[in-house]
């Protein structure tokens, strides 16, 4: 029986140092409406999300449409790059992708973040066999999850993601069978 997980990278957010509470921008809310419109066509059964506000706000229209509460899952929160803002994000993110076991002080290595994301993903798969499930999340953790099932999804793929973006991962049991990009702004 096929299970479909729709991973939704959050829409554009207004920068604040508060990672958990950072809201969507005006443009982000517009794109979140497009996310809802696209996913209305997919017969969604449940909606899960990272607890970060921007991820929740991106998928809350889908939850309202299907009249279900969003279930918050810590495992889908963004990977922690470092305990403090890094001087050069590009250098910092490149290093963790080149060495899966490297982590900056107070941050998560790719391997640790991936393990967290996969644990959450497998729990969702096990409790939603044969269903269509939306997961509001973040770019880095989303690609780490995809990479676990197919290593073609790596750093270069992450760099090409849009904000927001939607990927439908189809599973038979715990085996990923297909990946389709759903996001289309037009």
Language-model segments: which ranges?
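Generic beta-sheet signal
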Residues: 5, 131-140
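Short beta-strand scaffold positions
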Residues: 49-50, 115, 136-137
């Amino acid at each position: 029986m096929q299970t479909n997980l729709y991973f939704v990278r959050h829409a554009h957010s207004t920068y604040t140092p508060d990672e958990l509470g950072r809201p969507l921008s005006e443009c982000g809310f517009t794109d979140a409406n497009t996310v809802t419109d696209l996913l209305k066509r997919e017969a969604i059964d449940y909606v899960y999300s990272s607890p970060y506000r921007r991820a929740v706000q991106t998928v809350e229209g889908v939850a309202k449409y299907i009249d279900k509460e969003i279930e918050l899952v810590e495992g889908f929160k963004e990977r922690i790059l470092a305990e403090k803002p890094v001087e050069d994000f590009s250098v910092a993110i490149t290093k963790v992708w080149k060495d899966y076991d490297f982590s900056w002080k107070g941050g998560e290595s790719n391997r640790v973040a991936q393990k967290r994301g996969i644990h959450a993903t497998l729990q969702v798969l096990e409790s939603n066999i044969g269903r269509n499930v939306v997961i509001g999340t973040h770019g880095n953790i989303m690609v780490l999850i995809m990479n676990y099932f197919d290593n073609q999804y790596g750093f270069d793929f992450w760099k090409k993601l849009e904000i927001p973006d939607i990927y439908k991962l189809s599973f038979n049991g715990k085996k990923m069978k297909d990946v389709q990009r759903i996001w289309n702004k037009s």
